[in-house]
């Protein structure tokens, strides 16, 4: 552990094996890692902590995908679960955004299932509706899966499609749909979902058009520490090129 921490202090880029070594830390070793991490955090952003007042708007729970871990969608593997399928109207979505802004929210997050009837223009329409209803609010919306599906259904490339979303009022992308960026694990967890490369391509395109995004990582299911290391490395490598990721969010399974 100390050898790896020395490499961190020397500003060396950690290898997959070195990251796995850090994940093996126990007891006092964890404290040592935390101290180094805290110092790096201080050097990067200081001690000021900020937050946003956010409202999540999940516009549909209908989804054609078959992710084995999902506790939300009502699709092919969950037809008798989780209540009644729903799809909010554009007016419903706009009203929720307007209400959020009036209550002091600074951000809305837009996510939902991959509805079989959506075309790519649906996400453009949702963005327009939210921006019109809540002009000052930050619109944080649409997973890489939604973006990829929307572009595909319109026959557009990602840069063109994301540019249209930005023009409609989109401010940034969430990192969800990443789950764990290790395709061996994804083949078990979410076999019909986008691949690691497709997730990265979507976020690279978002950064290219000037949209920031974040990285999420779902952990605690069937993956292992090497999967975590792979996830960190591929997102670290993209960040080195684009600088477009604004935060990392760990999501316990």
Language-model features: where?
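Flexible, acidic/Gly-rich N-terminal and inter-domain linker regions that tether
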Residues: 1-64
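Conserved, mostly hydrophobic/aromatic
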Residues: 11, 37, 67, 110, ...
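Canonical Radical SAM [4Fe-4S] cluster-binding loop centered on the CxxxCxxC motif
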Residues: 49-92, 115
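Conserved radical SAM core fold
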Residues: 76-77, 107-109, 114-117, 144-152, ...
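Canonical radical SAM enzyme core domain
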Residues: 79-94, 115-166, 178-179, 194-198, ...
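Short Fe-S-cluster ligation motifs
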Residues: 91-112
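Conserved C-terminal portion of the radical SAM core fold
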Residues: 134, 138, 166-178, 197-253
């Amino acid at each position: 552990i100390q050898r790896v921490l020395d490499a961190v202090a020397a500003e060396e880029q950690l290898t997959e094996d070195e990251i796995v070594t850090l994940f093996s830390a126990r007891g006092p070793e964890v404290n040592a890692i935390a101290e180094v991490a805290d110092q790096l955090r201080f050097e990067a952003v200081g001690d000021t902590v900020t937050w946003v007042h956010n409202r999540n708007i999940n516009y549909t729970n209908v989804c054609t995908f078959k992710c084995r871990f999902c506790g939300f969608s009502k699709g092919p593997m969950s037809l008798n679960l989780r209540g009644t399928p729903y799809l909010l109207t554009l007016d419903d979505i706009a009203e929720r955004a307007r209400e959020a802004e009036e209550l002091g929210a600074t951000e809305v997050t837009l996510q939902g299932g991959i509805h079989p009837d959506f075309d790519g223009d649906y996400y453009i329409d949702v963005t327009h509706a939210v921006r019109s209803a809540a002009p000052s609010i930050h619109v944080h919306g649409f997973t890489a899966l939604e973006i990829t599906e929307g572009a595909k259904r319109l026959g557009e490339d990602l840069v063109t499609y994301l540019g249209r979303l930005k023009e409609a009022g989109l401010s940034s992308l969430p990192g969800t749909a990443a789950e764990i960026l290790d395709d061996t694990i994804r083949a078990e967890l979410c076999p019909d979902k986008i691949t690691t490369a497709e997730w990265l391509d979507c976020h690279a395109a978002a950064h290219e058009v000037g949209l920031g995004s974040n990285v999420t990582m779902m952990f605690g299911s069937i993956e292992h520490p090497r999967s975590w290391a792979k996830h960190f490395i591929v997102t670290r490598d993209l960040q080195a090129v684009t600088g477009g990721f604004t935060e990392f969010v760990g999501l316990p399974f």
